């Protein structure tokens, strides 16, 4: 059976996934409470959001010293979300090497029905066994090719083929750094669509670090993407994700059906999601540097922490992280960069005297 048959639904042309409760976990330092998750899931479900992603920001098993500890165990939040949603499916993210096969099984037992497996865009092969397990369990599968801006479209399409052959039903172009600009999205999505045909759908996950999350998502749809991510109020890492409420407004205006009510999702963003945010997701200097330099969006909070600890500018940390082409999982190298900048500052002060 082709993906056209599996995913056909007369109420949408594009299926939306709200990732406020996963990508937003980065912005909230993984401190979601059960009350917040229950309220947000209920509001998104009422608005007609078909898929809601719930996990630690770094996926199953992400609660750790390296990534940050969760206030509430993620499996409890997945279970609560599944019990709260009346129509929406609950998705969960896992990164091979962070999460395990047992984590996937537990998430399914707690009500998760869509397994989203993420790898760096050149390492799709590490996801093969996890896709195999997810399909054996009867889970819907989605693949994330993170930091998709770092390799050309034809190389990305080859990696997408690895995921599709392993059992992935939709492969995402993931602009983890918010670094892609319009045609960069279009070319990558088109390459994946051409490679995968009816074997798997193509999706797009954008960030706002250059202010292009919505525009890039429109480009993705016009190039053939059938699944799109966003977060209410841009609740995500860096400057946040493409705001779902804005995406729905734009899609309504250009005739792309999503099945989500614009006014209900605007209400959810304003009245339910916003109060759960520690602050608005800002397109400030730090976020812009990440988009401009191609830095993984979740590095923001880690860079701010090391900036405060060592007394060095966060935007300089982020720029050097981009120069070194660091990827997700290498957040600890920000400490080395901070020490390097600190030494340069100290030697400069000494030389001045």
Swiss-Prot record:
One of its GO terms (biological process) is catabolic process. Mn(2+) binds at residues 23, 205, 207. Residues 14-266 form the Pyruvate carboxyltransferase domain. InterPro entries: 2-IPM_HCS-like, 4OH_2_O-val_aldolase, Aldolase_TIM, DmpG_comm, DRE_TIM_HOA, PYR_CT. Keywords: Aromatic hydrocarbons catabolism, Lyase, Manganese, Metal-binding. HAMAP family: HOA. NCBIfam families: 4OH_2_O_val_ald, PRK08195.1. Belongs to the 4-hydroxy-2-oxovalerate aldolase family. This is 4-hydroxy-2-oxovalerate aldolase 1. It comes from Mycobacterium sp. (strain KMS).
